Amino acid sequence: MKIQNIIVYVFLIFSCFSCEEFLEEDPRALIAPETFYQSESDVRQAVVGLYSILKNNSIYGQLGLDLFYDNGADIIEPNRSTNVVEPLGNYSLNEAIADVSVQKMSVSDTWKDLYRVIYNANIILDNVDGNDAISEEAQIDIMAEVKFIRALCYWHIVNLWGDAPFYTEPLVLEEIRVLGRTDEDTILSTVVSDLQYAQVHLASVYPEEDRGRASKWAAAIVEAKIHMQEQNWQAGLNKCMEIISQSPHSLLGNYADVFNPNNEYNSEIIWSLDFAKDIRGQFEEGTLGADGSFPSVFGNGNWRPSMFAPRLRDEPKNSSERNALAAALQANGEAFNGTGLQVASKDFAGKFPRNDYRRALNIVDNYLGFDLNFPYMAKIWNLDVDNSPRFNHSDNRIVFRLADVYLMAAECENELNGPANAFQYINKVRERAFATQTEWELKGLDQQGFREAIYDERKWELAGECHRRYDLIRWGILLDVVQDLEYRFWTPNTNIRPYHVKLPIPLQELQVNPVLLESDATNNGYR
């Protein structure tokens, strides 16, 4: 059973402000925390409100984090020029463009919503600790969950902006307006501390009705990733091995089964955000029809599968067969009614090994016997018209899964000791991807050769799952990779600059708070 998107009072207030409104109003003056947090139920609702913000288009909903973690690299590009993807995909981003919101997606939207989660999390923590209306056991459980969510948001902020405003106590907005940027190492130190608290106190597994909640293993994988960012390979390996050996998670035998929408809580998935159809929320205002229904374009479930699904007007390759394709889809209860804005890049499609079973889920260039113009990622689309309509999907959003951890363990072991004991981890992932051991077994590589094998294996295994650009940046090879590629519509290979490894702080944030420029007048190189 999915956790329903409960739109609680606190979430409604904190999420309905524009940036300017958010900085002009003090939400705590509208609903005082001391009057809201009167029971464990009240607090649990507030925590669900944090998850609700994470599901916004700016973060895990449509293309929020995808814009920054997958676009502008070597796996994904759009099937046409579009202003949704262009600033990151073509590296034309600047401070002003960072403020331009398209369907609640922009650098600014992501910045605001990550900090909304943090703002709310600080208030929840302040009102739970020592609250006599809540049992001590519930207090600890709630604080662990909220600390994980806050840590996750700060981790994303550091990944995207580096040094950033940082606070862990409730502040009035006048105080927030004058915060400068804290060194990212200082932020990550607190993040790791919060993640370790979460691992001690969060559950390892949840009952069916709570399976959308983050477990201790979600906190563990983020900690492992931070250790790897810092090249603390032993700590990273230790944490990966803890997940592999102690968690209830296991790799599935079939890669395709990982992404089956009818088995969204399978054993490989460490954490996924659950979505439901027909939930009102961030697109409600100004979009409801007279009968209270949503226009079809503004469904408020998970938008993301629609971004990976084809548009019928773009397909098939032989346009004279379009009606026949539509009829074949209809007979299957399907439709090409997506946007096609996230398809496999030319380089990715051209290099994906043809004997790799994963190719069929990542490179779909023929469907129902019709050759297609573009290669699509079927692992993320859902063409089911009745149960997963356009922009209103109930599909969960996979955030972390165990195959990632095996590849992380392989990387850590190789960096520490060379590849001798690392092959077992990468081959564990590859084994299900090929027909024979001769095909899947890697052996005989030196340390650099194994390092390059990891570069490729993470690409094939985790394509479209918000890892690639982050990986290329932490490996220090983003510029080299992008400059060496040919793209369909744009020229990111000539536009990219060294400073593009970080985002600019949006211009409107700088105008409200000039202190943000005191430690770096260049705004991450964009000035």
From Swiss-Prot:
Subcellular location per the Swiss-Prot or TrEMBL entry: Cell outer membrane
**InterPro entries in the cross-refs:** SusD-like_N (IPR033985), SusD_RagB_dom (IPR012944), TPR-like_helical_dom_sf (IPR011990)
Record-linked PROSITE patterns: PROKAR_LIPOPROTEIN
The organism sits in which domain of life? Bacteria
Q: Which UniProt keywords apply?
A: Cell outer membrane, Lipoprotein, Membrane, Palmitate, Signal
Span of the secretion signal? 1-15
Where does the protein principally reside?
membrane
UniProt keyword Signal, yes or no: yes
Q: Which Gene3D superfamilies match?
A: 1.25.40.390
A single GO cellular-component term on record: cell outer membrane
Name the lipidated positions (N-palmitoyl cysteine).
Answer: 16
Look up and give the membrane topology term: Lipid-anchor
Induction pattern: By ulvan and rhamnose.
Annotated lipid attachment (S-diacylglycerol cysteine): 16
Transmembrane feature ranges:
none
Q: What does this protein do?
A: Polysaccharide-binding protein probably involved in ulvan degradation. Ulvan is the main polysaccharide component of the Ulvales (green seaweed) cell wall. It is composed of disaccharide building blocks comprising 3-sulfated rhamnose (Rha3S) linked to D-glucuronic acid (GlcA), L-iduronic acid (IduA), or D-xylose (Xyl). The SusD-like protein may mediate ulvan oligomer-binding before transport in the periplasm for further degradation.
Family membership noted in the UniProt record: Belongs to the SusD family.
Know the name of this protein? SusD-like protein P25
Q: Give the organism, scientific name.
A: Formosa agariphila (strain DSM 15362 / KCTC 12365 / LMG 23005 / KMM 3901 / M-2Alg 35-1)
